[in-house]
Amino acid sequence: MNSPIDPAIVMPDVQSSTDTRHIPIQRVGIRGVRHPMLVLAGDGAAQPTVANWTLTVALPAEEKGTHMSRFVALLEKYRATPMTPALFAAMAREMLPLLHAERGDITASFPYFINKSAPVSGVQSLLDYEMQWIARAVGEQVEFELVAQVPVTSLCPCSKAISEYGAHNQRSHVTVSAIVDGDFRMDELIRLVEDEASCELWGLLKRPDEKYVTERAYDNPKFVEDLVRDVAARLKAHPGIGRFRVEAENFESIHNHSAYAVVEG
């Protein structure tokens, strides 16, 4: 049985004591935290999801420990607030004085869903995308990075050119990491990637839709090299995007390995 706490007794705060080893810690905090998150979707609605969170701060050499419970308290504060890139950045900025830190990072990884209409029949279904938001705060300055993994179809130009009929095609993952401004929307980045693939994906297709996607991919063949270059060209031309990295992996249907390419800009 727990003994009662005497309010007259001051409990020791060990983590606030001085550390004598004089070794600063670049990142300390919590990771692997599954916590609800509301994301402001492209249609303006608040989409509920569950994110995997990592929150860390830098710890000066003279401090023994950080305030671990305050990370979770910060998550709880924003649990019911629809999150935007700008608000996510503000959350990272708020974390620093709360933890008495000069710099810190917040990362949230979560599934995001878009309701899509099939290209011919118009039947609607959800498609999921793996997203990651990263905010890096130094004082009042915050850098926001958006990471999106977009599944698409790719069709091989060489296979089409040498075959009398048909061409091998496969599902591909295009992962874009980009420094974006606070007004940037996830849907815009996803749409940009899908536009540059041989064809986009849908959760539900009828026979007329299957005919469309088969012929669409055949008319728009792309190597993995074409895919990353075309996406990179679009990112370079976008005024709301800074540094970026485009990674494409084609899960080859005629090999037991993937084709892979990366462009950084």
Curated annotation (Swiss-Prot):
A molecular function GO annotation: GTP cyclohydrolase I activity
Enzymatic class: hydrolase
Gene Ontology biological-process entries: tetrahydrofolate biosynthetic process
Domain of life: Bacteria
Pathways involved: Cofactor biosynthesis; 7,8-dihydroneopterin triphosphate biosynthesis; 7,8-dihydroneopterin triphosphate from GTP: step 1/1
Keywords for this protein: Hydrolase
Pfam hit, one: GCHY-1
Catalytic reaction equation(s): GTP + H2O = 7,8-dihydroneopterin 3'-triphosphate + formate + H(+)
Site entry: May be catalytically important: 156
Enzyme Commission no: 3.5.4.16
Gene3D superfamilies: Urate Oxidase (3.10.270.10)
InterPro entries listed in its UniProt record: GTP_cyclohydrolase_FolE2, GTP_cyclohydrolase_FolE2/MptA
Family designation: Belongs to the GTP cyclohydrolase IV family.
Function in brief: Converts GTP to 7,8-dihydroneopterin triphosphate.
Protein name per its UniProtKB record: GTP cyclohydrolase FolE2
Organism: Bordetella pertussis (strain Tohama I / ATCC BAA-589 / NCTC 13251)
